[in-house]
Amino acid sequence: MAERPLDVIHRSLDKDVLVILKKGFEFRGRLIGYDIHLNVVLADAEMVQDGEVVKKYGKIVIRGDNVLAISPTEE
């Protein structure tokens, strides 16, 4: 049986993920919520550029239309 995209995201709950946005911004943080529109809530969120943290946000909501990719980070 094929794996559904939301299954991958669900398994990433309470784990660190990398969220890549359409305009090239990247955020790293702990995924604490999402919905079917791919709106995501990150805790301990950081904006990352070239692998370096450029700003810390704490808890943020990212609108799903801006999301290009969500990737579980290496543990």
Swiss-Prot record:
| Keywords recorded for this protein, A-Z | Ribonucleoprotein
GO molecular function terms listed in the Swiss-Prot or TrEMBL record: RNA binding
**The keyword Endoplasmic reticulum is assigned to this record:** no
Q: Which HAMAP family match?
A: Lsm_RuxX (MF_00257)
Q: Organism source for this protein?
A: Pyrococcus horikoshii (strain ATCC 700860 / DSM 12428 / JCM 9974 / NBRC 100139 / OT-3)
SUPFAM superfamilies, sorted: Sm-like ribonucleoproteins
InterPro entries (UniProt xref): Lsm6/sSmF (IPR016487), LSM_dom_sf (IPR010920), Sm (IPR047575), Sm_dom_euk/arc (IPR001163), snRNP_Sm-like_arc (IPR022901)
Kindly provide the name given to this protein in its UniProt entry: Putative snRNP Sm-like protein
Limits of the Sm domain = 4-75
Q: Which GO terms describe its biological process?
A: mRNA splicing, via spliceosome
